[in-house]
Amino acid sequence: MSHSDTVALRGLIFFAYHGYYAEERKIGNRYGVDIYVRTNLQQAGTHDRLKDTINYETLYAVAKEEMEKPAQLLEHLGERIVQQIFNKFASAARVKVVIRKYNPPIGGICHAAEIVLRRKRNE
């Protein structure tokens, strides 16, 4: 089975309470999330049925739910999102999640700090 097709959500924006420092988790910050799911979309393309694809409304709900739960590290937050996607979509073969924290507290000017996770099912 080919997994060269992708369903993606790009540019999701959340205000959330993540960070290593307690103050970050108290005052919050703006975050961006991109999600890419590799799957086979042939059945969805042929039969025009939502059940044959990765429902991007559900992808958004996964991201929103996980963004609402505070985490110290973006890496931990990203892993939670990836695992929820694999749990909800049996057809998801690979997942890429990008999370960016805008204006991170690093002692200088920085538009965003970003992590990129790429995971294959059963890795």
Enumerate the language-model features and the residues they cover.
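N-terminal, polar/charged subdomain of small-to-medium soluble alpha/beta proteins
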Residues: 1-123
